[in-house]
Amino acid sequence: MSRTARRVGTVVLTAAAVAYLIWKIELRTTLDVLAETRLGWFALAVAIMIVTVPVLAARWSWLLRAHSIEERIPWLTRAYFVAYAAGQILPTSLGGDAVRVVETVRRHAGRTAVVTGTVVLERGLGGAATVLLGAIGFLLSIGRYDVSAYLWLEGVFVFGTIVLAFLFFARSARPLLRRAQPLFERVRLEKPLRAFYDAVHHFRNRPRLLAAVFTVTLAVQTVRILAIWAASEAVGIELDVRVYYVMGPLLFLVMLVPFTLNGLAVREAFFVSFLGSLGVGASQAFAAGFLFFLVTLLLAVPGGAILVWEGVRGGTTPRVKHG
């Protein structure tokens, strides 16, 4: 995908989201809602996001170790926080993943493909876990909340996950992938898809490890959705927590769209649209989305502080010797 196409897509999508928000919300009401934010709930949302980072670092260490790359969990935790900081500048959270790869490869020269594969595999399993959570959330909400308007979107993600699982896990899909390779190269997806494919097939004979990584991913996603619930409670939205297990996975997937400025306006528009379908006022829903944006900003603070400290100290990333 060319930079021009990405920029045009970003401008169009962001402008559409901003226009939708201007149409729906009242600024004065929104400011009043934010002024009455319950800080305890907001602090809980921030804490949930931060305390799960070392768990993600441990999960990543398992995948790296399978490739004979040994890294300490504190350093991997640092890499995650730095990636979150970078993600505030680069388009979508995928930009932060690229930073993780670069920093790790500096310490393990010549292992670019392997490191990229582990990060892309993390993303793939994370997407599958997110879709599974969304499906479970829909089942739990049946008869209590009407979220049928979003059923089609969840269905698209479920179908896409099934298709991708077939393409990347089934050997019979290899001829199809070879035929599609020119298309992937044209839209600049060939390298990340190949990295994911190679990573998956490296772990084909290690199903227990894949299952463990997926289980941890599912657990972390389950806990992190509670941060959305806490941010909503902070502005007085009192809905059953099960609703957020429909909303959260869809939000996580929407945030991966490459045509956003770190989710600016798109995230808030999704909050207004989804919560509005459940009777929540637009200004209150926007306030919840804005607070969740602040949560992601605070999640990036440790990484920003690390970069500033290392810059002042003039340190470099040391290489790890192998063998």
Q: What positions do the PLM features span?
A:
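Predominantly cytoplasmic-facing regulatory/coupling regions of multi-pass membrane proteins
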Residues: 1-81, 140, 145-256, 282-290, ...
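Extended non-transmembrane interhelical loops and adjacent amphipathic helices
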Residues: 65, 77-109, 193
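Membrane-interface alpha-helices at helix entry/exit sites of multi-pass transporters
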Residues: 73-78, 96-97, 107-122, 280-291
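Re-entrant/interfacial helical elements at transmembrane boundaries that shape
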Residues: 96-105, 261-277
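Selective transmembrane-helix segments that form parts of the transport pathway or gating/packing helices
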Residues: 120-128, 293-297
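Transmembrane alpha-helix termini and helix-breaking/packing motifs in multi-pass membrane transporters
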Residues: 132-144, 277
